[in-house]
């Protein structure tokens, strides 16, 4: 483990099939001691980590950001082509879209305008690392609607702050969706 730099004290690891999810405290010939985030201690034989897979979060910790990848499911019945009036309203009421011009001969949909807005909004936030991937994509539609996958990296990697940042961003998106005459899909019987 140590010779191949697979594991170091201070690394955050998760081990599938065990309750280990925390910071490596100690590595010996017989055990790897992990302090879990609930403050319990897990001990795992080094052989387990060599013979099976585990996830080491060191790369994320040392990188420029922590990945956020979530989807918002839009109600398919609310997706439509934008009228000229809709586009003018978007430009007037949503400052990030003030200079938006569709490609020649293209009539954008309200879903497309929302995706454009999401990308512009994320790139305007200092908490988002725009040097890393930022991808907004429409995935295959499902019985739960049309998923808009939002993929970006938060500059802040501290768990509590990371959760707050992504929650605030997605709260904002949920609040903006009606401005695009869209609805989030909600299952009802």
Question: For each predicted feature, which ranges?
Answer:
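Soluble accessory domains appended to multi-pass membrane transport proteins
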Residues: 2-103, 108, 112
């Amino acid at each position: 483990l140590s010779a191949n730099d697979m594991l170091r004290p201070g690394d955050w690891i998760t081990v599938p099939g065990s309750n280990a999810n925390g910071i490596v405290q100690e590595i010996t010939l017989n055990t790897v001691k992990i302090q879990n985030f609930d403050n319990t201690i897990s001990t795992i034989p080094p052989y387990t980590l060599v013979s099976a897979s585990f996830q080491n979060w060191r790369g994320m910790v040392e990188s420029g950001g922590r990945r956020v990848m979530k989807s918002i499911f839009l109600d398919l019945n609310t997706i439509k082509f934008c009228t000229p009036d809709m586009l003018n309203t978007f430009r007037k009421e949503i400052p990030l879209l003030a200079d938006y011009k569709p490609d020649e001969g293209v009539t954008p949909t309200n879903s497309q305008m929302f995706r454009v807005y999401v990308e512009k909004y994320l790139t305007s936030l200092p908490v988002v690392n725009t040097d890393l991937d930022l991808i907004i994509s429409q995935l295959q539609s499902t019985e739960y609607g049309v998923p808009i996958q939002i993929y970006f990296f938060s500059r802040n990697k501290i768990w509590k702050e990371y959760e707050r940042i992504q929650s605030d961003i997605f709260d904002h998106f949920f609040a903006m969706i009606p401005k695009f005459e869209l609805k989030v899909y909600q299952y009802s019987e």
